[in-house]
Amino acid sequence: MTNQAAEVAKRRTFAIISHPDAGKTTITEKLLLMGKAIAVAGTVKSRKSDRHATSDWMEMEKQRGISITTSVMQFPYREHMINLLDTPGHEDFSEDTYRTLTAVDSALMVLDGGKGVEPRTIALMDVCRLRDTPIVSFINKLDRDIRDPIELLDEIEAVLKIKAAPITWPIGCYRDFKGVYHLTGDYIVVYTPGHGHERTEAKIIQNLDSDEARAHLGDQYDSFVEQLELVQGACHEFNQDEFINGQLTPVFFGTALGNFGVDHVLDAVVDWAPRPLGRVAHERTVEPVEEKFTGFVFKIQANMDPKHRDRIAFMRICSGKYEKGMKMRHVRLNKDLRIGDALTFFSSEREQLEEAFAGDIIGLHNHGTIQIGDTFTEGEALGFTGIPHFAPELFRRVRLKDPLKSKQLRQGLQQLAEEGATQVFFPERSNDIILGAVGVLQFDVVASRLKEEYKVECAYEPITVWSARWISCDDKKKLEEFQTKAMENLAIDGGGHLTYLAPTRVNLALMEERWPDIKFRATREHH
């Protein structure tokens, strides 16, 4: 095996998906603790104080104590290199969160054991399904009251349409939480409270049918054995092929706050989740062990560093090897550049990078020329697919406070749209500017960045738009006829693409029925 192939085999690139407050920030900290990337985990409560959680950037995040921006953390674990892509976890996350899922090879789904499957989890799973991403599941908060575990597994299967295969099973919960039983390994991992902030070796009891296990479970022993028989009879067994194809998820139980069960999940990512996979481009499929470098940009982040008013383009490496000072081609602009200063991330601590391999995420300094979806190669003209725009779910009309600044407004919005901070639509019938977003917070972010970076103040007004659909049609005459009839609701987006802004769900359904030859798409590929 060549050095490059060995490096690729060591890589695991994944993201965490969860509903706000399911415990994602805490589990991120504990994963970093496992990888010895941080010496001691700060509890979530300290997030709003001076000790920001390691993945909180930008002024507004500091004020709100939330992580708006998707950051990347790399750490070693069991002779593997883990790339963890953090996704904004609060109620108002953005399209960035969806796009981050296009840059990973697997995902970790964190569920609150007291609440089960929640709306954001469903939305994120829909995005994972676009690429059949393998999912590992962690049912969190066992140190509190949780719902019946069998009921939780049924809900995962019914709502998320994926088979659930429990690997560990909880012994009690809240004050009676005694640990988890490993279903295939036949051993108990004992839970001892109070070790949330450090790395500790958990005590193991071999064999459920042992005096030690009986003593540990006490009064719970008989009912637990009975429950296990039911579980083993009713639940799916783990199957590697079904997992890799995104049809089955292994399920683990634990408490991230108590730092218990998190290592089981990380072991599953190392043992079962795929190494970096081949990536489809318009021209061909690119394999990770190919010698030549390729990569694509899935996110652009502004002002990570308040001292430097720069923007960083996050690039997922698909093949080859990045070396400091190498030359690469920016395919869309057909321009060669020498990259001497790519960054690797341990959250906000930026470090200069000497080399990186397929599966790794690197940061390129961007002075406004790089866009989301851009491909970089060592010369070959390639364009990777599968980095879409997602139809916004919320819309606002922009009103400028100073009418003389309309040029700055357009310039600012164009740039923010290229970064993926928002989507911009220019209606065919008016001079309005409409912004689209996936989460309410994106509007606040855009307004504060327009003010700080472009010295433009704007306000928002409500507008009757339910959703946007990108329009295409193979029949030019039909398209022209549609454009004439639907002019009222048509707009051009920031990339120059024809878009239908549907005022209601019913309206969209009617239009799709009335115009069968017109394609109304909920996603649009970049470029």
Swiss-Prot record:
An individual GO BP term: regulation of translational termination
CDD domains to which the protein is assigned, alphabetical: RF3, RF3_II, RF3_III
GO-annotated cellular components: cytosol
tr-type G domain residues: 9-277
Localisation per UniProt entry: Cytoplasm
Major location category of this protein: cytoplasm
Matches recorded under Pfam families: EF-G_D2, GTP_EFTU, RF3_C
UniProt: GTP binding residues: 18-25, 86-90, 140-143
UniProt keyword annotations, A-Z: Cytoplasm, GTP-binding, Nucleotide-binding, Protein biosynthesis
GO molecular function terms listed in the Swiss-Prot or TrEMBL record: GTP binding; GTPase activity; guanosine tetraphosphate binding; translation release factor activity, codon nonspecific; translation release factor activity, codon specific
Protein family (similarity comment): Belongs to the TRAFAC class translation factor GTPase superfamily. Classic translation factor GTPase family. PrfC subfamily.
Function: Increases the formation of ribosomal termination complexes and stimulates activities of RF-1 and RF-2. It binds guanine nucleotides and has strong preference for UGA stop codons. It may interact directly with the ribosome. The stimulation of RF-1 and RF-2 is significantly reduced by GTP and GDP, but not by GMP.
Name of the protein in question: Peptide chain release factor 3
Lineage: Bacteria, Pseudomonadati, Pseudomonadota, Gammaproteobacteria, Pseudomonadales
Encoding gene, per UniProt annotation: prfC
